[in-house]
Amino acid sequence: MSVGRRRIKLLGILMMANVFIYFIMEVSKSSSQEKNGKGEVIIPKEKFWKISTPPEAYWNREQEKLNRQYNPILSMLTNQTGEAGRLSNISHLNYCEPDLRVTSVVTGFNNLPDRFKDFLLYLRCRNYSLLIDQPDKCAKKPFLLLAIKSLTPHFARRQAIRESWGQESNAGNQTVVRVFLLGQTPPEDNHPDLSDMLKFESEKHQDILMWNYRDTFFNLSLKEVLFLRWVSTSCPDTEFVFKGDDDVFVNTHHILNYLNSLSKTKAKDLFIGDVIHNAGPHRDKKLKYYIPEVVYSGLYPPYAGGGGFLYSGHLALRLYHITDQVHLYPIDDVYTGMCLQKLGLVPEKHKGFRTFDIEEKNKNNICSYVDLMLVHSRKPQEMIDIWSQLQSAHLKC
C-alpha cells in the first residue's frame, strides 16, 4: 500500500473517531438536561470547602489553628475570612512567657487544678537548653539507642538498669548505647537538692541528659520533644530507638534478635509497642490521667503505652520534624500517637510488650520472660534478678 493511501486511511479513521466522540458527548449532555429539567447548570448552594466550626475544648481549638497554619488550603481560607490577624499573635512555638489569654478563653480556668493551669499557660514553650549533655554518645553509629525516662531521685532504678538490661555493648558491630532523660526537680515540688549526687553520677557513667525544665508528669511530652531534638542533632544515625520508663524490665537480647530479623522495608518506619485503640480522656478527677472537658474532646488516636516502645531512627527524625505541627499534650504517649497520626502512621501492637504486666502465676517463672520485650513494672532488684537468670547458661525453657 502506498504512503498516500495509508495517510488517507488514517485520516478516515480519525474522522470516524471524532464523530463517535461528538455523538457520545451530545447524548450525555441531552441526558443531563433531561434530569435537570431546564437544561441549566446546577450550582451548589453552599461552599464545597469551608472552615468548620471551632471546637469548644481549648486544646482542640488551638490545634485546629495550628492545622490551618500548615495546610495551604486552610491557610488561604483563613486569610480570606480575616482570621489570620487574630492568629498571628498566638501561633508562635517556643513562646515562653505565660499565655495569659488562656485565663479568659478557657471556661472555668480558675477552677482547674494547678497542674492544668501551668500546662496551659506554658503550652507553647519548648525552648529549654541542656544542662547535662553527652555529645559523644553516638560517635560510633548505634544500632540501638536505649532512652530511659527518669527523675533525679531515682538513683537505684538507673543503677539497676545499668547493671542489667541497659548495659552498653558493641558485639558484632551492633553498638548499644544508653541515655537517661531528666528535667529539673525543684524544691517547690518537694524534692531535695541532689544536684551534687547527680553531677557525680553523670561524670562517672556519662549517660545523663538533663534539660532546664520542670520535670513533672504533664511535661513528659515536652521531654519527648526535647529528646527527639537531641536525636536529630546528636544521634541522627542511630538505626533504632527504644524509649521507656525506668521501672520496666526489658529483654534487650530479644529486641536485638527481633530487629535483626526485619526487612529494610519493615524497619524503615517501625513503631511497635502495647498499642491502645479507641481510648479517650478520663473524666474522673481522682485519676492520674484525668483531662477536663474544657481541655480536650474526642477520642485519642492509636498510641503505644508509655511504659516503652521501639521505633526506627529514621522515624525518630520524622517525628521530631512533625512535632512543630502538634501542640503539646498532658499525656506523652498520647502525644506521640498524635504525631504518628499526623505522619499518616499507625503504631503496631506487639505481643512482646506487656505494659500491664503478666499473670501473677507467671511472674516468678523465668521462662515467661524469654519471648517478651518489655514488662511493666519491676523494682530495681527484680530487674537485676530477672536479667541474671536469663543470662544463665543452664537456662532451659
UniProtKB/Swiss-Prot annotation:
It catalyses: a beta-D-galactosyl-(1->4)-N-acetyl-beta-D-glucosaminyl derivative + UDP-N-acetyl-alpha-D-glucosamine = an N-acetyl-beta-D-glucosaminyl-(1->3)-beta-D-galactosyl-(1->4)-N-acetyl-beta-D-glucosaminyl derivative + UDP + H(+). It is found in: Golgi apparatus membrane. Residues 29-397 are lumenal. One of its GO terms (molecular function) is N-acetyllactosaminide beta-1,3-N-acetylglucosaminyltransferase activity. Changing D245A: Loss of enzymatic activity, no loss of B3GNT8-binding. GO terms for biological process: axon guidance; cellular response to leukemia inhibitory factor; keratan sulfate proteoglycan biosynthetic process; O-glycan processing; poly-N-acetyllactosamine biosynthetic process; protein O-linked glycosylation; sensory perception of smell. InterPro entries: Glyco_trans_31. Its cofactor is Mn(2+). Its EC number is 2.4.1.149. It is a single-pass type II membrane protein. The chain crosses the membrane at residues 8-28. The keyword Transferase applies. Glycans are attached at N79, N89, N127, N173, N219. Keywords: Glycoprotein, Glycosyltransferase, Golgi apparatus, Manganese, Membrane, Signal-anchor, Transferase, Transmembrane, Transmembrane helix. Interacts with B3GNT8; this interaction greatly increases B3GNT2 catalytic activity, independently of B3GNT8 enzymatic activity. Beta-1,3-N-acetylglucosaminyltransferase involved in the synthesis of poly-N-acetyllactosamine. Catalyzes the initiation and elongation of poly-N-acetyllactosamine chains. Shows a marked preference for Gal(beta1-4)Glc(NAc)-based acceptors. Probably constitutes the main polylactosamine synthase. Belongs to the glycosyltransferase 31 family. This is N-acetyllactosaminide beta-1,3-N-acetylglucosaminyltransferase 2. It comes from Homo sapiens (Human). The lineage of its organism: Eukaryota, Metazoa, Chordata, Craniata, Vertebrata.
